[in-house]
Amino acid sequence: VVTITLNLANPSKGQYSSFVDRIRNNVRDPKLKYGGTDIAVIGAPPTREKYLRINLQGPRGTVSLGLRRENLYVVAYLAMDNTNTNKAYYFRNQITSAELRTVFPEATAANQIVIQYGEDYQSIERNAQITQGSQSRKELGLGIDLLVTSIDGVNRKARVVRNEARFLLIAIQMTAEAARFRYIQNLVTFNFPKKFDSDNKVIQFEVSWGKISRAIYGDCKNGVFNKDYDFGFGKVRQAKQLQMGLLMYLGRPG
């Protein structure tokens, strides 16, 4: 399993950007081009090497994520508990116990724990118990400092579902979503390393990855859409206005 590491003990803007680029480059098929653009496209679903491991090396320990390479869905994470035992927590319908052993060999089968809620944002948000504002991940914010704080909430601690869910919401957005959307990657580097308030555009991007990918795949020529599109933050006519980092795999270009 390919492992990509982000050092958060002494991070820099450049390190974070190249980390996101490495995720993107690991899953892309350089031969695939959609809509006459140069936007990276995920390769066809792999038969081997289905997962990617991401190590988030915080100043006080490492927590790791497991991602599906065919869509960058976060399917599991690995953290030490309060007895210094490696535990792997996973979404059962996204990865099997045997596959989990290949991603996180540090955790024995006895130390694999099923996450009892769904892997979709709404389920994770409910378990994060966000009380302010929209009660969604938007209220948590984003940023390197926040990622470090959220890692500390799950590293070398007894499991607390609220802290786990908050860590997942922040980590998913700063890894997989940043790889899909340069807009998010750029916000993190612009505010580096500080925590910043998320905005509606971030959320609209995150729920529109499929829609945007399909529009570029099926209704775009030389980077220009055949009509105006509105993905929730104003009309766009050119694909480059979307600052996309990675498109969903939709087959060979038509």
From Swiss-Prot:
Q: Which reaction does it catalyse?
A: Endohydrolysis of the N-glycosidic bond at one specific adenosine on the 28S rRNA
The UniProt keywords, alphabetically, are: Hydrolase, Plant defense, Protein synthesis inhibitor, Toxin
What's a Gene Ontology MF term here? toxin activity
The EC number on file is 3.2.2.22
Tissue specificity, per the record, is: Expressed in seeds; most abundant in the perisperm.
Chain's role = Exhibits N-glycosylase activity. Catalyzes the release of one adenine from a ribosome. Acts as a ribosome-inactivating protein and inhibits protein synthesis in a rabbit-reticulocyte lysate system and in various cell lines (in vitro). Induces cell death in Huh-7 liver cells. May contribute to the protection against plant pests and predators or play a role in regulating the death of plant cells.
Task: Describe the family membership recorded for this protein in Swiss-Prot or TrEMBL.
Answer: Belongs to the ribosome-inactivating protein family. Type 1 RIP subfamily.
What is the additional note? Thermostable at 68.9 degrees Celsius.
Specify the protein name: rRNA N-glycosylase sapovaccarin-S1
Q: Which organism is it from?
A: Gypsophila vaccaria (Cow soapwort)
The major lineage groups are: Eukaryota, Viridiplantae, Streptophyta, Embryophyta, Tracheophyta
